[in-house]
């Protein structure tokens, strides 16, 4: 009985070593890039019915600004996973209608073009090793 109890305790302790750990930023960025590639390659109809989003400044705070722009697009299942992934990169909670100083508020572009621009920028960041 004592041996069985010892084994249960040992397995419980070892179970902590096998538990999932946070995804490294490089892996998360690579997964986001792959998702954006899938979106841009699998377009048969206009992405999100041609919805328009605010253009963003890609030089700083790109993840939160991109999420702020895309969060206002509703009813578009093609970008839902991208929204969730961007949410993981953004340190603060983003809600619909939120405005950022990083957004270029006078320019709206189609979601498809926004995704392509974001993809090119994220590929550049990945090549340069800028994962955060």
UniProtKB/Swiss-Prot annotation:
Chief place where the protein resides: secreted
Pfam family name, one: IL13
Carbohydrate-modified residues: 38, 49, 57, 72
Cellular localisation: Secreted
Record's signal peptide: 1-18
Record's GO cellular component terms: extracellular space
Any single biological process term in GO: immune response
Coiled coil ranges: none
Swiss-Prot/TrEMBL keywords: Cytokine, Disulfide bond, Glycoprotein, Secreted, Signal
PROSITE patterns per the UniProt record, alphabetical: INTERLEUKIN_4_13 (PS00838)
Annotated GO MF terms: cytokine activity; cytokine receptor binding
SUPFAM superfamilies associated with the record: 4-helical cytokines (SSF47266)
Intrachain disulfide bonds: 48-76, 64-90
Annotated family: Belongs to the IL-4/IL-13 family.
Summary of the function given for this chain in its UniProt record: Cytokine that plays important roles in allergic inflammation and immune response to parasite infection. Synergizes with IL2 in regulating interferon-gamma synthesis. Stimulates B-cell proliferation, and activation of eosinophils, basophils, and mast cells. Plays an important role in controlling IL33 activity by modulating the production of transmembrane and soluble forms of interleukin-1 receptor-like 1/IL1RL1.
Record's subunit section: Interacts with IL13RA2.
Protein name: Interleukin-13
Gene: IL13
């Amino acid at each position: 009985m004592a041996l069985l109890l010892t084994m249960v305790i040992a397995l419980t302790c070892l179970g902590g070593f096998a538990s999932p750990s946070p995804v490294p930023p490089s892996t998360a960025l690579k997964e986001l890039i792959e998702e954006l590639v899938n979106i841009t390659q699998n377009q048969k109809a206009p992405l999100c019915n041609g919805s328009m989003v605010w253009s963003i400044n890609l030089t700083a705070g790109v993840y939160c600004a991109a999420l702020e722009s895309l969060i206002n697009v509703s009813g578009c299942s093609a970008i839902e996973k991208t929204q969730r992934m961007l949410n993981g990169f953004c340190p603060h909670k983003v809600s619909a209608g939120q405005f950022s100083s990083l957004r270029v508020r006078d320019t709206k572009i189609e979601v498809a073009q926004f995704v392509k621009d974001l993809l090119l920028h994220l590929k550049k960041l990945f090549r340069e090793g800028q994962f955060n």
